[in-house]
From Swiss-Prot:
Name of the protein described by the UniProt record: NADPH-dependent curcumin reductase
Gene name tied to this protein: curA
Species per Swiss-Prot/TrEMBL record: Escherichia coli (strain K12)
InterPro entries recorded: ADH-like_C, ADH_N_2, GroES-like_sf, MDR_fam, NAD(P)-bd_dom_sf, PKS_ER
Organism lineage string: Bacteria, Pseudomonadati, Pseudomonadota, Gammaproteobacteria, Enterobacterales
Reported function: Catalyzes the metal-independent reduction of curcumin to dihydrocurcumin (DHC) as an intermediate product, followed by further reduction to tetrahydrocurcumin (THC) as an end product. It also acts on 3-octene-2-one, 3-hepten-2-one, resveratrol, and trans-2-octenal.
Compositionally biased region (Basic residues): 1-10
Length: 345
């Protein structure tokens, strides 16, 4: 009797969401694990990163990256172990960073893999503070924001993996850091653990008034990854020559139409002109991929010296990926969201 083949579970895009994603937009499929060919490796996913950008990849509107095809495996960064290798640079047991997506196993040519060393202490951190979110925080703040000692930095989504890192780098550079988060618990974490000077709950009815009070000298840098009413409150407080790095607009990812209310574009453009504001969007891989080693060197040192604190929210089981992702887009997460797909033995 032949040995039973291993099975590969994968979440595919069943339909494109209209508004917020729902469980029916995803479908769990299963088939035999493929065998690697010449020059290929078979990977077993250990950790899967869930990130807001994935919502954009579920839509077929023009964007900086192609959409996931209907029936295609959902995209996502992964930390995996090599199970079988026909590639000279990899051997069984190697830890690698890649983009296998929402599935148990994947076949790779090795071209898109990064080795993590034989015994990485916290392998999942390569999906967070030492990976794409940390890199996004680092380059957006330091290259576009260009913080100077004594300036006021406002950070949206202050306890998320990007915002938390932005705020802590801002403190290292001597800024007064004002965080914005959803709820008292997250705000306490921002001030007591991350070292923010102030953190405000954007759910408060008088949020705009609280922000003005927290920024008596105005705002020099606003790190934007949310949009919506937070930006509305920030706009009148911006100082001359303020900088606004834009890495995301989570509040509008599920929008199907423009929000009701007055047209804010004329005020925005007038403010940008009169105050000579630098407002710049960026895509981390395309714009700063060539500086990844600079980031890894400096961030790795900061983490080693305990100058950067990092919080993960790990959910066990690939089967829980869709519901966890839906919760992420609703702001239910607290820290970097990771799915533990398999044990790391």
């Amino acid at each position: 009797m032949g040995q039973q083949k291993q099975r590969n579970r994968r979440w595919v895009l069943a339909s494109r969401p209209h508004g917020a994603p729902v469980p029916e937009n995803f479908r769990l499929e299963e088939d035999d694990v493929a065998t690697p060919g010449e020059g290929q490796v078979l990977l077993r996913t250990v950790y899967l990163s869930l990130d807001p950008y994935m919502r954009g990849r579920m839509s077929d509107e023009p964007s900086y990256s192609p959409p996931v095809d209907i029936g295609g495996v959902m995209v996502g960064g992964t930390v995996s172990r090599v199970v079988e290798s026909n590639h000279p640079d990899y051997q069984s047991g190697d830890w690698v960073l890649g983009y296998s997506g929402w599935q148990d196993y994947d076949i790779s040519s090795g071209d898109d893999l990064v080795k993590l060393g034989d015994h990485p202490q916290n392998p999942s951190w390569s999906l967070g503070v030492l990976g794409m979110p940390g890199f996004t925080a680092y380059m957006g703040l330091l290259d576009i924001g260009q913080p100077k000692e004594g300036e006021t930095l406002v950070v949206a989504a202050a306890t998320g993996p990007v915002g938390a890192t932005v705020g802590q780098i801002g403190k290292l550079k001597g800024c007064r850091v004002v965080g914005v988060a959803g709820g008292a618990e997250k705000c306490r974490h921002a001030t007591e653990v991350l070292g923010f000077d102030v953190c405000l709950d954007h759910h408060a009815d008088d949020f705009a008034e609280q922000l003005a009070k927290a920024c008596p000298k105005g705002i020099d840098i606003y790190y934007e990854n949310v949009g919506g009413k937070v930006f509305d409150a920030v706009l009148p407080l911006l100082n001359t020559s303020a900088r606004i790095p834009v890495c995301g607009l989570v509040s509008s990812y599920n929008a199907t139409e423009l929000p009701p209310g007055p047209d804010r574009l004329p005020l925005l453009m007038a403010t940008v002109l009169k105050k000579r504001i630098r407002l710049q969007g960026f895509i981390i891989a395309q714009d700063y991929g060539h500086r990844i080693h600079e980031f890894q060197r400096e961030m790795g040192q900061w983490v080693k010296e305990d100058k950067i604190h990092y919080r993960e929210e790990i959910t066990d089981g690939l089967e829980n990926a869709p519901q966890t992702f839906i919760g992420l887009l609703k702001g239910k997460n607290f820290g970097k969201v990771v799915i533990r797909v398999a044990g790391d033995d």
